[in-house]
Amino acid sequence: CKSIMQSSSNLFPVALISAERRGDLSEDVYRLKPGNSPDGTVELAVTRLGLADVPENRGTPVILLHGSFSNRRFWYSPKGIGLGAYLARRGFDVWIPEMRGHGLSKRNQAYARNRVADYARYDLPAIGAFVREQSAQIPHWIGHSLGGTTLAAALGGQYLGAPAVASVALFGCQVSRNYWPLKIPPVEWGGRFILKRMAEVSGARFKRGPEDEPVGVLIETMRWHGLFGRFGDTERDWWKGLADVDVPLLAVSAAGDHQDPDW
């Protein structure tokens, strides 16, 4: 069904924008408009996967967060391949959000200024609340690359916690790697100056992935790695806040991952 259908939620406006059968899987795509951030134009697309022949027999909810320059297709290809499809076929209730301006999530008005801080403070709590409402269960969260970093920020900033998170799995993400050139203030300042002249960085042009990234995320990352930088925002130190988080955690890294290498 291609037309926009109303979906029931007591949290904020939600529309079911498509409901399709994809082989042995069901694919429902929701558009969330939480209205909880300073930019009221933010809308988030969330894809729900399940077994087509048993639509009412939903299992344990799992939320999959994609990385930078990516979208839902990292987890679930058009041919039904990927971890999202794998988990759905094994009875899990799979939810795949797409970050602002990625995939089916349209660009918000302040797209260029989007930051991990915004995703962590506003978007992930709204997504988590919607999944809990629809599934009546506490979801497990899996994050890859920037998705995992955003999830860690939400936990360290106390925006997500045990009442909303059954467990966390982080794949190929880190914030502790040193980028020594960024410790030299003129280098960091020069990088920021160049980036501020842009709205986004093209994933296709730089062969990073199918999506663009807002320049705000890159400037924020440079600040984390600057001379006096920290993993946090002006209000909270997310790194220190992680010490107070009490949820089951699985962290996976690989020696062959040169961008987010194994310790």
Residues of each region from the PLM?
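Conserved alpha/beta-hydrolase "acid-adjacent" motif
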Residues: 258-263
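The feature captures the conserved acid-bearing segment of alpha/beta-hydrolase catalytic domains
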Residues: 237-244
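Short, surface-exposed "cap/lid" segments of acyl-processing enzymes
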Residues: 53-104
